[in-house]
Amino acid sequence: MNDVMQAVGVFFSYAVLAVFAQNAVFTRGLGVSRLVQLVGDERTSSGWFALLLCVTQVLVAPLAFYAGGFIAARPNPAQLRPLVFLACVAVVSLFEFIVLWAARGKRHGGQLLRILPLAAVNSGVLGTVLVERAQSFTLEQSMGFGLGSGLGYLLAVMLVTEADRRLRSEAIPEAFRGLPITLVYIGVLALAIYGFTGHSVIL
């Protein structure tokens, strides 16, 4: 029982860590291009996007964990690692596509099917997996960090979306309006997080 509670505690502690102190967007710049695309896109629900991203991260984590252990004994693990992890992401994406295709006639099924490529084929997914393996996370740490990274991405989307509404002031020079001021805002938020965690990442 103690082992189970300890594993659950590790899972949630790494999830919280990934949401705030090690936010994929603000500390490593993962998925920024996709985030900028989401802001202002009323066709794509940020909530459904984050849900698919979280599911993808959690499903990829165990696959990448065991695949990483398998290739560790190979002659060139560093060269194989990105290819193997891309294959893990592809397998999970195919599984999600099959499930959503079967449910496409149900409520939100078609919308989720359209969002799936945006959420699954994302540098945030592959980058998070590479961080997990580079830091030699355990299985529960990897899954918790994956879930937290997805939730942290949602937090970043919400913050940038709110900023997009507020940064339409006439006081902002025309040359900075739109994407430039959005990137400046993301940079300021990243610096604020560095103020809590220090310049180097804490993992």
Question: Which residues fall in each region the model found?
Answer:
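Generic transmembrane alpha-helix signature in multi-pass membrane proteins
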Residues: 29-35, 99-103, 115-118, 123-137
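Structural signature of hydrophobic alpha-helical transmembrane segments
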Residues: 10-25, 77-91, 143-156
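Interfacial loop-to-transmembrane junctions
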Residues: 165-184
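Transmembrane alpha-helical segments of integral membrane proteins
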Residues: 154-170
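Cytoplasmic-side transmembrane-helix entry/capping segments in multi-pass membrane proteins
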Residues: 43-55, 81-87, 108-120, 175-180
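Hydrophobic core segments of alpha-helical transmembrane domains in multi-pass membrane transport
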Residues: 13-21, 53, 59, 86-98, ...
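Ordered, amphipathic secondary-structure segments that act as subunit-interaction surfaces
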Residues: 66-114
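Juxtamembrane boundary at the C-terminal end of a transmembrane helix
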Residues: 2, 6, 191-203
